[in-house]
Amino acid sequence: STAAEDGVTDNDGNQIEAANLAPTLQAARMRAQNKSAVRSSAYAFAEGQGGASGSFSVGAMPGDGCAQPKGNTLFPELTKAAFELEIALCPHREPSSMIAINRNAQFRPHTDSGAGAGQSTSLIVGLGTYVGGELVVESETKDIRYKALEFNGWTERHWTMPFEGERFSLVWFT
């Protein structure tokens, strides 16, 4: 396969060779390709067909008065692994302070909210045994399944296309 098919896009839109991806991401991608998807969506599901949708955050909230995400204490190993994955996917990238972890979430068109200053470019990757579920950024459809993508979630409208199966996404940001 080619880098365009398997690679990660850097800040300049250049493809990073698949051989440079984190071995764990490559292994997860191969496992997912060998499984068939089951029907699911972000808003309706049948028992055994993907399950409920939801989102939570991990990381460090800015400012002294902000409560830290509960996900940090509920899932410390996941938090550590997710931040390590960001470094493995994009070693050139300034490490993020937060990660949104989403399961079977189908987001409507939106821009991310925040304090309005200092936010970083978002990094997203899709994981799981699903079909569909592409990310649309300013009307351009992007396949993020086991392919990391950087985009400006604070200024660019983005949303999730319908999907079938179990879909996770990790979104790193500051």
Regions found by a protein language model. Name each.
Residues 1-148, 154-174:
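Fe(II)/2-oxoglutarate oxygenase catalytic core
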